């Protein structure tokens, strides 16, 4: 943590120096604020684009971290005529110290950029002598390797002129010198105090102050390893076993977990090796590369044990990276770090520095959810057509040959030519597809292989969707794995209408990006292949995720779900219940799966999941079953809706002045059990689309954190306007008075019922409408209503006397009496009541 925190501070210092702005934490959230005067001569180079400033600093610091690893290999500052590995293991720090002050005050341009662009990215022949600028500063002729790969390729951002002070680099290099940089990140049990590439990924994902707003969270290494292993086991079972070979399943599990292959026959070994060589794995929200790296670390020993000494570790790694692993992310910075980790994974096993492979068409930037542009479908662009006006086979062949060839190391001039050829071929394919000229023109202006608007799955990963015949027509990925973003899609999201059109699960309540990633992940797979995601657990139940559950039941066979509650705190500094779901793309009506918790599990049968029970991933216990036997639900006896006004859209109608045309505005935070706290806001009556304000209505919280003991809580109000952070209901059946309904809503029984199914921080009105409400005789109702009246009177009296401090009114005894009567109405036994009381 010390390393992460100090790294963040150095990063923030450099950003602040250029832009005058810094992210500061306010209310648990990072907010960008103006903190000092910007260095205007440099800030102007970015034209006020603060994100570009952050990206510039992020990339520069990423390169500096990479150099820390390189110098530990002894590959930097190698004396002329000396062997690789004999270099200066503190090269960067010494290069800086040897420079005079004029160079130190312009160290980026005078030293680092020649090192990046004219050394590490430039083939200077066998001797690899560093440019004069570097040798002059260092004080002797030295060797610097040519690494290729792309990390040190100059881009448009690099052309910005920035001059940091010597104090900036002095501080950064002294900070780096405090830590041991070690390249190997394969061992999850490694406790050495140092910085490895896995930590580099963690740094990056924690560095993005807006990552949490984007719904991106860093996945712990242990969970990554579990998901990679379980996915690989499920894949090998599917590819190499018949359905009834139970004993062989144990052998495969032992092979993946312990790399034990002695129990396999030669044929079994050959089948497994072929499956491992052929496997295609993708993370569609790759982040800093945790899951692809995890898969590399799992595949490598499995292939090694089956091939013996036939290939070296580095040869196997290069084969796996080239043939088995793919990734996409909407953030360019994430893609840069993910590629960097793969290069480091290769370097760790290299005796001497060799040009690194190009990962431009392996780990790529793009919007994984869209393969269209301006309403035009681009997914069929590389579908071979013949006999039409145009035969596109030749163009496709040229394109795929160029993409595949790009992986091989080239100098930057050759790479630029190949990129131009690839784009030219794509534009030609678009013309052959007869797309509108305007669309083709707009596409030609974009960087097609690095943009945040769409991703050409079937073009860039043509080899995945057009596999050779010996792969049995498996067109698509074998494993899709990852931690997709968790973010509600807002009404003003520019892509919302496209998502609504393209995704089945984008309907019914609030849409979350992770819902769409589930559907897209399944779409990217071929039949009988494996998807493994870690996401919020909110899809277990709730109206907002009913369409997602239905999609699962109709398209997938869930293998298992491992559930982590909020208390498990899977993600640092985030309270979020999550679940690891492993499923197979396969329609199965007889599937049974388990939801595993820390001390228990819940068995779910597909046959029990249907439209009637909203496909809820929870088997009803005896208490729920009894409560469901009630003849009526809230929907049958009352009108219920979410607030009177939208707090965001109607804020122009809010005021602090009371008038005859306004009523008090109530927000959810003002509501508690049987009481409300008056505020100072009023809302104009003209904001209402329907006016029920003259009625006595039950008003209760719409936002209620999952961790709260009591999540259903409300009171009765009249002549108020409720914001949409409240829910509102009132009786439409004289046999069910408002005060009786309020007692049921505030009861422990209905709170237990709601919490059993709901895994969100909201109280969706659609779920409230389905609450079962017990019938009661007039006498039974009256007994409860009398108690409600006493509570309301006590709360009201207390508020008057104690200036809104409702906690001084202890009505717990009266509330316990109501709970006892409600339990009786639901027909619950003493043992069942005990379960609710202890929950």
PLM features: residue spans?
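Polybasic, glycine- and aromatic-enriched phosphate-binding surface used to engage nucleic acids
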Residues: 144, 155-162, 166, 185, ...
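SAM-dependent methyltransferase catalytic region
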Residues: 41, 45, 186-191, 213-561, ...
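Structural motif
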Residues: 47-61, 191-198, 508-509, 657-660, ...
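C-terminal substrate/ligand-recognition segments
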Residues: 213-238, 276-292, 477-482, 697-705, ...
